[in-house]
């Protein structure tokens, strides 16, 4: 590592720490010649991902573009900057773990929607309206109705169905006892 002060290539590591959720290592170094201290960061170099857009053009995956879109959707909600950063990191990690080096913008949009759906419904609707190119109020109403339907389906308590099964078992055993 070259010293930023004297350009000497000999330095020693004084301290190493994991940063950014284990995505990089921060190293505190000391130049062996001039004795100045400086910090370096070591990151994993990812293979670039190409994004295939709707118009069939390609561009390199841009993390900051993803972050901007999610920040915009989460404005004036209770979603914290750390939660947004976590979502971006998780999406980026999923893209990097994929064996494919080319992904469509629609696939990225669907990933964002999955995370925002769990994080905040308002942010989900905002992102969906831009991503889905809503043309009018009908598109919003359809999406809201779909959210409400999913909410109703997921709110059916498993305890309720268990209680129903127990009641059936009790009825069956009482019938057996009555017939004995």
Curated annotation (Swiss-Prot):
Residues 148-180 are annotated as: Disordered. GO terms for biological process: negative regulation of DNA-templated transcription. InterPro entries: ATP-cone_dom, NrdR-like_N, RNR_NrdR-like. Binds 1 zinc ion. GO terms for molecular function: ATP binding; DNA binding; zinc ion binding. The keyword ATP-binding applies. Residues 49-139 form the ATP-cone domain. Keywords: ATP-binding, DNA-binding, Metal-binding, Nucleotide-binding, Repressor, Transcription, Transcription regulation, Zinc, Zinc-finger. Signal peptide: none annotated. A zinc finger (unnamed) spans 3-34. Residues 171-180 have a biased composition (Polar residues). Pfam families: ATP-cone, Zn_ribbon_NrdR. Its cofactor is Zn(2+). The keyword Transport does not apply. Negatively regulates transcription of bacterial ribonucleotide reductase nrd genes and operons by binding to NrdR-boxes. Belongs to the NrdR family. This is Transcriptional repressor NrdR. It comes from Gloeothece citriformis (strain PCC 7424). The gene is nrdR.
């Amino acid at each position: 590592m070259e010293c930023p002060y004297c350009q000497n290539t000999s330095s020693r590591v004084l301290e190493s720490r994991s940063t950014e959720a284990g995505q990089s290592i921060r190293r505190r170094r000391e130049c062996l010649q001039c004795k100045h201290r400086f910090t370096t960061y070591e990151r994993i170099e990812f293979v670039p991902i190409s994004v295939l857009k709707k118009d069939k053009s390609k561009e390199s995956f841009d993390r900051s573009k993803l972050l901007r879109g999610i920040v915009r959707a989460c404005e004036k909600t209770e979603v914290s900057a750390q939660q947004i950063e976590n979502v971006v990191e998780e999406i980026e990690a999923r893209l990097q773990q994929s064996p494919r080096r080319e992904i469509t913008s629609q696939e990225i949009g669907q990933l964002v929607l999955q995370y925002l759906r769990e994080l905040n419904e308002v942010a989900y609707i905002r992102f969906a309206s831009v991503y889905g190119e809503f043309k009018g109020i009908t598109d919003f109403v359809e999406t809201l109705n779909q959210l409400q339907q999913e909410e109703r389906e997921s709110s059916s308590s498993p305890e309720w169905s268990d209680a129903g099964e127990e009641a059936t078992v009790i009825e069956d055993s009482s019938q057996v006892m009555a017939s004995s």
